[in-house]
From Swiss-Prot:
The keyword Transmembrane helix applies. Keywords: Acetylation, Cell membrane, Cytoplasm, Differentiation, Glycoprotein, Golgi apparatus, Membrane, Transmembrane, Transmembrane helix. PANTHER family: NATURAL KILLER CELL-SPECIFIC ANTIGEN KLIP1, PROTEIN YIPF3. Glycans are attached at residue 334. The keyword Cytoplasm applies. Belongs to the YIP1 family. It is found in: Cell membrane; Golgi apparatus, cis-Golgi network membrane; Cytoplasm. The modification N-acetylalanine is found at residue 2. One of its GO terms (cellular component) is transport vesicle. This is Protein YIPF3. The chain crosses the membrane at residues 146-166, 185-205, 212-234, 238-260, 272-292. Involved in the maintenance of the Golgi structure. May play a role in hematopoiesis.
Amino acid sequence: MATQAAPASGVRNGAGPEWGGFEENIQGGGSAVIDMENMDDTSGSSFEDMGELHQRLREEEVDADAAAAEEEDGEFLGMKGFKGQLSRQVADQMWQAGKRQASKAFSLYANIDILRPYFDVEPAQVRSRLLESMIPIKMVNFPQKVAGELYGPLMLVFTLVAILLHGMKTSDTIIREGTLMGTAIGTCFGYWLGVSSFIYFLAYLCNAQITMLQMLALLGYGLFGHCIVLFITYNIHLHALFYLFWLLLGGLSTLRMVAVLVSRTVGPTQRLLLCGTLAALHMLFLLYLHFAYHKVVEGILDTLEGPNIPPMQRVPRDIPAVLPAAKLPVAVVNATAKAIAVTLQSH
């Protein structure tokens, strides 16, 4: 048995060359036992790897959705921000335009330097121009000088308003559609501005050398005669006295204006049209102011009918010529005072 085993082992040990390499590979392959201590503890199982991969994919999807949402929000906010910025720019432009217009209007109407040349006049000059407005000029061969200021004419218009108010109150005038002050201001300023504009238009048609400012000054100083006539005749009511002052004082101021326009107009037809229109309007306006806002004060009849007659039964009438001329002003003033007292007591 030993002899049989020996060859067998010898055969195994002494195998042919074809088996030598295989045996060496088997012997050199090492042990089949796995050393668990040499394994890496950080390496996970396949299930753990799949979980991590799934979690990573979910995080990437969430990040992609968040990025898409942020992009959409950015686009929406960008459009909204653009519209808001555009509206703010439009509002800012409108505000700036309105501010510029308001500043221009304020600078135009509130700057006193613009109006200073029209009211920069000495009282002595105004007094001399008032006297000159009642003196007609004789030389009409060359254009006469016209004052280019508005202080004197404006003060004369306000004086006429005050005199007209006095005449309305003493004549017991009733204005149903407005106050006495509004009616007086509208009448005086309406005549001054309206007639000046109309005469300036006619002067332009007739080729007269006069400006609107000069026309306002000329007509304004022409109201000086009206103020004197109305102030006297509102306190002393005599038709003869009124017509005398109307022709004398009103005629002198009208002739002064006519002479100035004649000196600045070329052609007889143009002169007749322009000067005739101005003279007619100026003289008729004085008649209107006298007869439209004035009647005899009812208290004057106290000297004729007695103070016991009710005011509603009185009839306006002229003062008879029986009163002496020297006592007439005193009698009229006394009667006017009595009339005012009776009227106040009756109301």
